[in-house]
Amino acid sequence: MACNLSPMRKFHPYAVAAEKQGKKIYHLNIGQPDIATPPAYFDAVKNFELPVLEYAASPGMPILIKAVQKYYEDLGIHYEESDILITTGGSEARQMLMLSILDPGSEVIIPEPFYPNYNTFIKSAGGTIRPLTTTPEEGYRYAFREKLEALINENTRAIMFTNPGNPTGVVLTHDELRTIADVAKEHDLFVIGDEVYREFVYGGEKLATIGEFDDISENAVIIDSVSKRFSACGARIGTIITRNKLLQQQLLKFCQARLSVATLDQVASAALYDVDSEYFDAVRREYKLRRDTCYAKLLEIPGVVVTAPQGAFYMMAALPVDNADTFQQWLLTDFDDNGDTVMFAPGEGFYATPGKGRNEIRIAYVLKQADLERAMDLLAIGISKYNETH
């Protein structure tokens, strides 16, 4: 199995070398939120008083499963406790799911650009990605019946997408999700909604979810996580939710093989689900401000093509450069402006189609507004100087 280096992390050695030279790097390459984790998490850890830190149950601790169940009840979606499995982060959820539904040669339809680790999870299960290519000029939208059906063959097992989108920030409408659900139902495919950014939608609308459609309950799978929602990436708590009992049985085998998810992280994460909705209101306002800052600054750079993201905290942008990988390396090794430089995730690694995304980048707007403004200025200066010599 050959897997590519992560576009978010592969330039880390160059960044370390640049920092040793005294350069300050504005990191836009990884979606690590700087928003404070709610105190409820740490309070729950401090108040944990059992005399023995035992293994938790393999499917997850009841206190956390019930918290997740209530969260979806409040959204108007009922799941039984047995429909919910707790995982060690969203990454384990994706890995277990691919191992459960794919055979060697199986294919998963995924709109590209996509979260690069999907490639690793699918390849490790013997499958391949069947990409549905989107473009910045079309706003990276992909829920078109004719395009989806053109990719389906006898090896297709699932349609998988992130909603809101990573790396594009695209938010699917109810009608778009209905289209995907109908295609999945008619062709008996799993439809996998990776909804780890569901709280971060900036138009004021309620996020549509694949869990809304009762007629595809046997096909639908939701992947969720506390990492981004509660700014608790280090907690490593994820969720797989499906009403498909055969799939649940297969997933449970993997849960039992890895024994259990960390007890303390589950206890503390359960407390996060009691956080007041005002927390999310404040976080959304902050991310919307950051999005607007980045988007406005990018529009000022000649030759940049960018669409305002509707959700999550990422945006893709096409740059007037020949190769974003080469450009990023140059920014770290040969460029600075008053000792400052910038780091993003080159776009080619977010595509399965060879050559696609070569001049694109993903920006994670997870810095304070003033830092984002400086980072965008550095990007503009860098593009100008790079194109003078390349």
Tell where the protein language model's regions lie, with residue ranges:
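Active-site PLP attachment segment
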Residues: 212-250
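PLP-dependent enzyme catalytic core of the Aspartate aminotransferase-like
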Residues: 78, 149-150, 330-343, 350-390
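N-terminal small-domain helix-loop-helix segment of the aminotransferase-like
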Residues: 2-89, 96, 147, 272-275, ...
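Conserved PLP-anchoring active-site segment centered on the Schiff-base-forming lysine
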Residues: 100-122
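Active-site phosphate-binding strand-loop segment of PLP-dependent enzymes
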Residues: 135-203
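Conserved glycine-rich beta-strand-loop-beta hairpin in the small C-terminal domain of fold type I
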Residues: 270, 286-295, 306-319
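Helix C-cap/helix->beta junction micro-motif
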Residues: 18-21, 125, 186-187
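Structural signature of PLP-dependent enzymes
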Residues: 249-255, 273-295
